[in-house]
């Protein structure tokens, strides 16, 4: 708080969580009663509050409150009008059938509906252990609890299936945001870049985690930016190919076998957690908290560390890496793509109009006029594939990606500008937190 110059008492008010609470409930399953415990934490500096719901056997109240604070600052940083919240249910979803999970999810949602942050004041989404299926169940329960509020009840949940009011591009949004974050930082001449390079072409990239975020980030960076993803690490080991991994083939192998190990297109190293220590230009920890810590930070051989997971670099590791000249893009910024597209989904649900519906054909006709005029002026016909791409009016996913890129680029500019104005901040993480907290303080 020393860089902020806030009025007396305001820092304490910002730190406080408005509504941390515990829910306990029972569900009759398998001929007996099972008891469950969950938590929800709400920070109401701005409404509605946005917070994803995770199902994890190691969840606890302290983690939920910390993640709610992180969501508050993340929304503030990217200028999304949400307060922060978080929810968790202490459960291993793999131990229950889909039918049992539905009963549990609906009861959990009913308990949350009894609380003061119900319905239009909240916006939940998916996280670890939850997905489109669970979000559809939750939305249905919110609607049952608020039968007269059919206009806004669908907007209380994001990450829904497209058929239930979801939005194109939500599944890829965090990984896509990682790509835009890297592009934005490299494009900025105030950053060191990658040995002077301002793009990812040929850049060796190591990614820890091959779930939703890691997969999409790897795919987009390799297919669209020509990066070489040389190492992919998971819990049971890592795979490596100095020429670059085939991401789609590796994903299909993981789906078939349940592991990335044994992939034909790479060398597999089982049981070794040193994948993140392999030499590379870009290191993307996209799996777990505290993946880079004081004991292994000295062995990192990356020029740029991109925090796609929440809290993957500890405080001590951060200091070690920066003392060695490593640039770190902070999680508060890098993984904000998910909440940005969740905001787009909520807007879509509130307006009940898909993005692009009102202008797609008008834009298509305008592009057709331009293409025809150019062909007449030059006397040459455009190649069919180029013409078709140019004439495309813009599907919903194109508009979602465009909006996300704009948010990530403008947010990076805010962070870099603040670093330039206040060099004493020292690093991009501190600059991001200062920019975010100032915005919260102004609300």
UniProtKB/Swiss-Prot annotation:
Q: Which GO terms describe its molecular function?
A: glutamate dehydrogenase (NAD+) activity; glutamate dehydrogenase (NADP+) activity
Question: What SUPFAM superfamilies does its record include?
Answer: Aminoacid dehydrogenase-like, N-terminal domain (SSF53223), NAD(P)-binding Rossmann-fold domains (SSF51735)
An example of a Pfam family matching this protein is ELFV_dehydrog_N
Q: What is its EC number?
A: 1.4.1.3
**SMART domains named among the record's database cross-references:** ELFV_dehydrog
Query: Matching CDD domains, A to Z?
Result: NAD_bind_1_Glu_DH
Q: Which UniProt keywords apply?
A: NADP, Oxidoreductase, Plasmid
Keyword Oxidoreductase found: yes
User: What InterPro entries does this protein's entry cite?
Assistant: Aminoacid_DH-like_N_sf, Glu/Leu/Phe/Val/Trp_DH, Glu/Leu/Phe/Val/Trp_DH_C, Glu/Leu/Phe/Val/Trp_DH_dimer, Glu_DH, NAD(P)-bd_dom_sf, NAD_bind_Glu_DH
Paired cysteines (S-S) = none
Q: Which EC class is this protein assigned?
A: oxidoreductase
Active-site residues, Swiss-Prot/TrEMBL: 86
One Gene Ontology BP term is: glutamate catabolic process
Q: What's the catalysed reaction?
A: L-glutamate + NAD(+) + H2O = 2-oxoglutarate + NH4(+) + NADH + H(+); L-glutamate + NADP(+) + H2O = 2-oxoglutarate + NH4(+) + NADPH + H(+)
Q: Which family does it belong to?
A: Belongs to the Glu/Leu/Phe/Val dehydrogenases family.
The molecule here is called Probable glutamate dehydrogenase
């Amino acid at each position: 708080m020393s860089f902020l110059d806030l009025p007396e008492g305001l820092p304490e008010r910002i730190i406080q969580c408005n509504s941390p609470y515990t829910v306990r409930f029972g569900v009759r399953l398998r001929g007996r009663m099972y008891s469950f415990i969950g938590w929800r934490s709400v920070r109401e500096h701005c409404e509605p509050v946005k917070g994803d719901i995770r199902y994890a056997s190691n969840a606890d109240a302290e983690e939920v409150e910390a993640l709610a604070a992180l969501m508050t600052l993340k929304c503030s940083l990217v200028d999304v009008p949400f307060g922060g919240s978080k929810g968790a249910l202490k459960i291993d979803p793999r131990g229950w059938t889909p039918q049992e999970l539905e009963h549990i999810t609906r009861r959990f949602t009913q308990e949350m509906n009894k609380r003061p942050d119900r319905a239009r004041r909240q916006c939940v989404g998916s996280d670890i252990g939850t997905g489109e299926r669970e979000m559809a169940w939750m939305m249905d329960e919110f609607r049952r609890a608020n039968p007269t509020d059919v206009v806004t009840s669908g907007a209380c949940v994001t990450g829904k299936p497209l058929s239930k009011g979801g939005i194109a591009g939500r599944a890829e949004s965090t990984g896509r945001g990682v790509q835009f974050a890297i592009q934005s930082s490299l494009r900025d001449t105030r950053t060191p870049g990658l040995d002077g390079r301002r793009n990812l072409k040929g850049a060796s990239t190591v990614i820890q985690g091959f779930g939703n975020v890691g997969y999409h980030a790897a795919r987009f960076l390799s297919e669209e930016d020509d990066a070489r993803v040389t190492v992919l690490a998971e819990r049971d080991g890592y795979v490596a190919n100095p020429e670059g991994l085939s991401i789609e083939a590796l994903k299909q192998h993981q789906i078939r076998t349940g592991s990335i190990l044994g992939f034909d297109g790479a060398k597999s190293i089982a049981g070794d957690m040193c994948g993140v220590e392999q030499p590379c230009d870009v290191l993307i920890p996209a799996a777990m908290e505290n993946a880079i810590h004081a004991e292994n930070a000295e062995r990192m051989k990356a020029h740029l560390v991109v925090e796609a997971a929440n809290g993957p670099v500890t405080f001590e590791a951060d200091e070690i890496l920066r003392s060695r000249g490593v640039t770190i893009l902070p999680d508060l910024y890098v993984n904000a793509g998910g909440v940005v597209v969740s905001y787009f989904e909520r807007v879509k649900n509130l307006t009940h109009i898909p993005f692009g519906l009102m202008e797609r054909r008008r834009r298509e006709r305008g592009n057709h006029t331009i293409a025809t005029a150019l062909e007449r002026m030059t006397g040459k016909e455009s190649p069919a594939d180029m013409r078709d791409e140019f004439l495309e009016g813009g599907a919903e996913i194109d508009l979602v990606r465009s909006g996300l890129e704009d948010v990530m680029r403008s947010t990076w500019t805010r962070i870099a500008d603040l670093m330039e104005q206040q060099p004493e901040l020292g690093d991009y993480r501190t600059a991001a937190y200062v920019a975010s907290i100032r915005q919260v303080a102004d609300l």
